[in-house]
């Protein structure tokens, strides 16, 4: 049975077109049952739900961003999806807040049925301008999904093309890959992989000491990447105005 845990691993961003560039960095992620966040907090002194701590998950940093409980928002998306009634447990894969700060380029929600089979995936994409867009996609026999890009993420990519998501059900190891394709040419590939660790105070503290200020590192890496791309002459796209939250439910029914 799938259980809440940590995953420690690596993120790789590989830009392929119109120029080549690569960025990789070490990370750790929380993989948690969204109905058990308070229970996890009661068992781990270094983790809290909606309260300041060394590590935390805040409802306001997900979904509509207005403090709506994560589980209410995500279960609402699941129930509106085709075969959503088959989903019995949902886990979120994300960076936790570190000392109150977080930026999650992508939070992934995995929906499992009573037999612990993946039935639904929700990809919650954030940009650095305060926008958020969720893609709700059924998970069947294949471990590849596709969604048209409808959201401004990078100032170096227009809102065009489609995403291909490649994933495996998290177990002792996990892996997730995303490819952005425009006009049949791959533009960007991103990967995250990790090895499972028990979710306890010892591993939380060890993760902090190994990769301190995780999410500051993530946002710094994003901006360093942007400076490199500007230096190489890549053209900027105009960013959107204001914070938004939109949902593409590709499994409604």
Model-predicted regions and their roles:
Residues 1-253:
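Mature, function-bearing regions of proteins
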């Amino acid at each position: 049975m799938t259980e809440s845990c940590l995953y420690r691993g690596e993120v790789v961003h590989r830009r392929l077109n119109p120029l080549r560039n690569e960025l990789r960095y070490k990370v750790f992620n929380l993989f948690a049952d969204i109905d058990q966040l308070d229970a996890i907090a009661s068992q781990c002194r270094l983790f809290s739900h909606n309260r300041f701590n060394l590590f935390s998950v805040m409802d306001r940093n997900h979904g509509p961003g207005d403090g709506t409980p994560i589980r209410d928002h995500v279960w609402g998306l699941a129930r509106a999806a085709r075969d959503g009634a088959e989903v019995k447990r949902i886990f979120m894969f994300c960076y936790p807040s570190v000392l109150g700060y977080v930026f999650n380029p992508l939070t992934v929600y995995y929906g499992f049925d009573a037999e612990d089979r993946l039935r639904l995936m929700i990809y919650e994409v954030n940009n650095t301008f305060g926008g958020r867009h969720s893609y709700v996609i059924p998970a069947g026999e294949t471990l590849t999904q596709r969604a048209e890009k409808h959201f401004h993420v990078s100032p170096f990519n227009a809102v065009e093309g489609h995403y291909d998501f490649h994933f495996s059900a998290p177990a002792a190891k996990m892996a997730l890959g995303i490819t952005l394709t425009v006009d049949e040419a791959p533009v960007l590939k991103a990967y995250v992989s990790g090895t499972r660790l028990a979710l306890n105070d010892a591993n939380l503290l060890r993760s902090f000491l190994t990769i301190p200020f995780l999410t500051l590192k993530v946002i710094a890496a994003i901006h360093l990447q942007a400076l490199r791309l500007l230096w190489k002459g890549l053209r900027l796209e105009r960013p959107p105005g204001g914070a938004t939250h939109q949902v593409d439910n590709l499994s409604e029914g």
